[in-house]
Design a protein with these regions (language model features):
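Structural/interface elements that position substrates and couple domains in central-metabolism enzymes
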Residues: 1-372
Length: 372
């Protein structure tokens, strides 16, 4: 069952996070529905990313209440938690079957049953199943795992600005640092965070700390990372103005609207914020994405034919999603055939050879590269 878990964020005019709230209503309703229809000895495994404490403080009491209401024993069911680590894109199935899993249960019997089930779908010959002591631990593990990545991304934002001010190539700098094993996952610059995980998961932990555990402490750094990441599109927009000047009433082309490369998914894509900023100064905007023909959140058509959008006179072409299609030789050659224009690579998609080639004809800028 796929269940929505909503986080409502509130921001000021600077896109700084000012507050948030987590609604568990739809999740609780779905759990109640399960309890009204499941067997007495059911195994329930929660894979959804949930606020720590959810299995014990929400799922468990609801299931037991519904079973008792039906006149069934409420001590025979089993409840486990094993969060998914799916990676959208061409390797989606492999990211489920051939990736390590963490799991737990509300008791040892539930944990054993969860392990037995996971062994039927996970290739344990190459992937470890790591058992934690209880569901609080696995729930924390998931939001900590994603908060770490969100913070890593937000960390690089201010260094992108510094690199541009210092006429430095942050990509080369990061590559050099990555040679050190302890720093091998340092992130590259980019337009921002999108999708249905990193945009909210740190907030689930912050909410849970108060709502489920009555804590007086705060996860300030994790919450701050969400606020910083939400502001990344504005930074990219301001940099575009610095480099290319005022583009009021200019023709702008976005290449890519998905939140992730080689995926047709626009949920919480950072491109949406950048699009809104650009739309405020010009209505002459074209959109292209090889995986999407309609942008639901913006209620607008998206072109899938690259030649159609390139045939129009474009004042600025924004590389906004890391689709491999855009760095193919065929696409580069098409870009070389159009009239001289401005190209803004917000994600560091092009390699040095491609940058050199495109720069022979176009005015090219790359986010995080002050050397060009």
């Amino acid at each position: 069952i796929d269940i929505n878990l909503d986080v409502e964020k509130k921001s000021n005019s600077k896109d700084e996070l000012t507050g948030f709230d987590v609604s568990m209503d739809s999740f609780a309703k779905a759990v109640s529905e399960i309890g009204r229809n499941c067997k007495e000895e059911v195994l329930i495994i929660v894979e959804t990313t949930v606020p720590p404490g959810t299995c014990k403080k929400l799922v468990k009491p609801i299931i037991e209440e519904e079973l008792a209401r039906r006149g069934l024993q409420n001590n025979k069911y089993k409840l486990g938690h094993s969060y998914e680590r799916v990676m959208p894109g061409p390797n989606y199935i492999n990211s489920i079957r051939e990736y390590p899993r963490v799991y737990s249960g509300i008791d040892s019997q539930s944990a054993d049953a969860t392990e037995a089930f996971l062994k039927t779908i996970i290739n344990t010959s190459i992937c470890n199943l790591t058992r934690l002591n209880n569901t609080n631990e696995t729930e924390i593990a998931k939001v900590l795992e994603n908060s770490y990545r969100a913070m890593n991304i937000s960390f690089i934002v201010e260094w992108s600005r510094f690199a541009e001010e210092a006429d430095a190539n942050l990509y080369s700098i990061v590559n050099a640092i990555r040679e050190r094993e302890t720093h091998s996952n340092l992130m590259y610059p980019g337009i921002g965070v999108g999708g249905y995980c990193l945009t909210k998961d740190p907030l689930l932990a912050s909410w849970s700390q108060k709502a489920h555990f009555d804590s007086k402490n705060d996860l300030n750094m994790s919450t701050k990372s969400v606020s910083i990441n939400d502001q990344m599109p504005k930074f990219a927009y301001r940099r575009m103005i610095e480099v290319f000047g005022n583009f009021e009433d200019k023709n702008i082309l976005f290449l890519g609207i998905s939140y992730r490369g080689d995926v047709g998914d626009t949920r919480f894509t950072p491109v949406s914020s950048l699009y809104d900023y650009v739309k405020a100064v010009t209505k002459k905007i074209s959109l292209h994405d090889p995986y999407i023909n309609y942008w639901e959140e913006q209620d607008i058509k998206v072109e899938q034919d690259i030649e159609t959008v390139l045939s129009r006179s474009q004042d600025i072409i924004i590389i906004s999603t890391g689709h491999s299609f855009y760095k193919k030789d065929e696409t580069i050659n098409k870009l070389m055939k159009i009239q001289s224009t401005n190209i803004y690579d917000t994600i560091g998609l092009f390699n040095n050879d491609q940058i050199a080639k495109l720069s022979q004809k176009h005015n090219l800028s790359v986010l995080g590269r002050g050397d060009i």
